[in-house]
Regions:
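Short loop/turn motifs enriched for small/polar and acidic residues
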Residues: 100-104, 162-164, 221-223
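N-terminal, polar/charged subdomain of small-to-medium soluble alpha/beta proteins
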Residues: 1-128, 132
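Flexible, gly/pro- and Lys/Arg-enriched active-site loops
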Residues: 41-46, 123, 168-175, 187, ...
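Hydrophobic C-terminal alpha-helix "anchor/cap" residues
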Residues: 83, 87-88, 148-149, 196
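Extended accessory regions or peripheral subdomains of proteins
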Residues: 125-145
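A short coil-to-beta-strand element that immediately follows conserved catalytic motifs
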Residues: 94-98, 154-160, 213
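Short, surface-exposed acidic-centric catalytic microdomains
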Residues: 43-58, 143, 148-188
């Protein structure tokens, strides 16, 4: 069940800025009207009457104004996307944000009052499995954790201990070093997959033998409670419940995380797998 957040609302903030497709819009400028909903937890501020326990909407309004005035975009879509990301990165207390940017009297030569773009963006929690059985496996895993933590829109929150595990599938190969991590990210699933593939490639990963030896293997196990089934990406990972080398380190950092389809927790899946292997 998703957590319900409180809301801090900023409505119809007027900003004179220079966004648009036409050159005149970029040079002469025009009025934009911005509304924002900041999804957060106001409980502590409500109990203590302490502004530092909340989000200062005056500072947020000033940030929005400055951001839209110092940057120039052709599309409202781009302006909204960049603004939402900037706000989420600037204030840790904002878990999710809704942004609407209105453009009154847009130059379309028709009698309209306004056009607008409204988006909702927020933080997501992903669990990533790590594995290596070629070369300095610990170095490869450590470097992968570091690379993920250095992504501007992601933060590694917890990393499991690394475990030495026997190979899965193709057994005629060296033992693996495996682990799992919890990632807080603004990336969407396919964006995250692209980053994982990039990190694997930089580690010299070659996809020659299915389930074969590799310098680095990174898999998305969970992404919030998303269920996604595509040819090139399935979430939750379809084999996770069969893999002790995933469930053991994952159980260390998220034992009660539940599978969105089966409803079973990670520790329950691990117990069942151990029973089957007896």
């Amino acid at each position: 069940m998703q957590k319900k957040f409180d809301e801090i609302r900023i409505e119809d903030l007027e900003v004179f800025a220079n966004h648009g497709v036409f050159p005149e819009e970029n040079t002469l400028g025009q009025k934009f009207v911005v509304s924002a909903v900041l999804f957060t937890d106001t409980r502590m501020a409500g109990k203590t009457d302490d502004l530092t326990a909340s989000i200062h909407y005056g500072e947020v309004s000033a940030f929005i104004t400055e951001f839209l005035q110092k940057n120039t975009y052709q599309l409202l879509e781009r302006a909204a996307e960049e603004l939402a990301e900037a706000l989420l990165l600037e204030w840790d207390r904002i878990e999710k944000i809704s942004i609407e940017i209105k453009k009154p009297w847009a130059p379309v030569r028709l009698p309209l009052k306004t056009v607008s773009v409204k988006i909702e963006r927020g933080w997501h929690t992903a669990y990533i499995a790590l594995g290596s059985n070629i070369g300095d496996s610990k170095m490869y895993l450590d470097n992968a954790v570091k690379a993920l933590n250095e992504l501007p829109t992601s933060k590694v929150e917890v990393v499991s201990e690394y475990l030495v595990t026997p190979p899965y599938g193709v057994t005629d190969q060296p033992d693996f070093l495996n682990g799992c991590l919890k990632l807080r990210t603004l990336l969407y699933p396919y964006e995250l997959l692209a980053e994982l593939n990039r990190i694997e490639k930089e580690a010299g990963r070659e996809r020659i033998i299915h389930w074969g030896p590799r310098t680095l293997d990174l898999d998305i196990i969970f992404y919030d409670d998303l269920v996604l089934e595509e040819a090139d990406l399935c979430i939750p990972h379809v084999e996770m419940h069969k893999r002790k080398f995933v469930l053991e380190p994952l159980g260390e950092i998220a034992p009660y995380k539940r599978h969105p389809i089966s409803g079973k927790s990670v520790c329950e899946m691990l117990v069942e797998l151990n029973e089957k292997e007896k």
